[in-house]
Design a protein with these regions (language model features):
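A ubiquitous, low-specificity "background" feature that marks scattered single residues
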Residues: 6-7, 29, 37, 132, ...
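Surface-exposed loop/turn and secondary-structure junction residues enriched for glycine/proline
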Residues: 5-8, 13-14, 24-25, 82-84, ...
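Helical substrate-recognition/capping region of FAD-dependent monooxygenase/halogenase enzymes
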Residues: 61, 136-225
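Intrinsically disordered, low-complexity coil segments
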Residues: 40-49, 65, 90-102, 181
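Eukaryotic endomembrane system proteins
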Residues: 6, 120, 180-181
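Conserved mid-domain beta->alpha element of the FAD-binding
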Residues: 73, 79-167
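Short, surface-exposed, charge-dense and proline/glycine-enriched linear segments
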Residues: 15-20, 26, 37-41, 98-111, ...
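Conserved FAD-binding catalytic core of PHBH/FMO-like flavoproteins
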Residues: 1-81, 85
Length: 225
């Protein structure tokens, strides 16, 4: 009976955690990311043997005084939020000077929470960056050394992704403050969303100056534009 279940929203309780609600197809299906019990640093979710009923019970504690009467669970899973990043996106060892022959992209390079769809966004950016360079080299339009730029460019963005997601995860799992609940202070999740709007929208990608990218010293609009 939660009135906004068909709207994307974050439900924050004072003590029981948070739920992220994402409406899906059909007019009645929706996805819920439910925060479960806190784990010890040396503990994994698999050790606790959580069940579907545990998730539903946690959701009802968080959503109270509203209730969640589950008719059918299409799919469910338990996961730990793990932030990790690869050392490089190709097979060139540190200190070796040659063109790469093997490349990795997407989740093989960076892992994080599933919030905000960043895994898909950044993975597509990885493969687009690599794809156009491979085409140019294979068609003889560019020197194979062009492929060296892939790892450097995407590693920088992957680090930004993991750092941003770590902040997101901490904010979303933190209990709400009294000031947030009584409306005298803007919720931290709203501030985080505003601060990272361009990044989560995929429009904040910025590569360092190289032979592919000029410096931004002359990028301002001309007078009158």
């Amino acid at each position: 009976d939660f009135p906004d279940v068909r709207q994307k929203c974050l439900i924050s309780s004072a003590k029981e955690g948070n739920i992220l609600v994402l409406p899906r197809e059909g007019g009645y299906v929706f996805r819920m990311y439910v925060e479960l019990d806190k784990l010890r640093p040396d503990e994994k979710a698999a050790h606790r043997k959580f069940t579907q009923d545990d998730m539903i019970a946690a959701a009802n504690r968080i959503i109270k005084p509203y209730t969640l009467d589950v008719k059918e669970v299409v799919w469910w899973s338990i996961y730990d939020i793990g932030h990790s990043i690869t050392d490089k996106f190709d097979d060139v060892p540190e200190g070796e000077d040659r063109n790469p022959r093997v490349f990795t992209a997407g989740d093989a390079c960076h892992t994080h929470s599933p919030k905000a769809g960043q895994g898909m966004n950044v993975s597509m950016q990885d493969t687009f960056n690599l794809g156009w360079k491979l085409i140019q080299v294979l068609q003889g339009r560019a020197n194979p050394s062009l492929l060296r730029s892939y790892s450097k460019e995407r590693l920088t963005e992957a680090k930004r992704l993991v750092e941003t997601d770590h902040k997101w995860s901490r904010v979303m799992s933190a209990p709400t403050t009294q000031a947030e609940r009584d409306g005298t202070e803007e919720p931290r999740i709203i501030r985080q969303f505003k601060d990272n709007l361009e990044f989560t929208g995929g429009t904040a990608v910025k590569y360092d100056t190289s032979y592919l990218f000029a410096a931004s010293a002359h990028q301002a609009l001309a007078t009158g534009e």
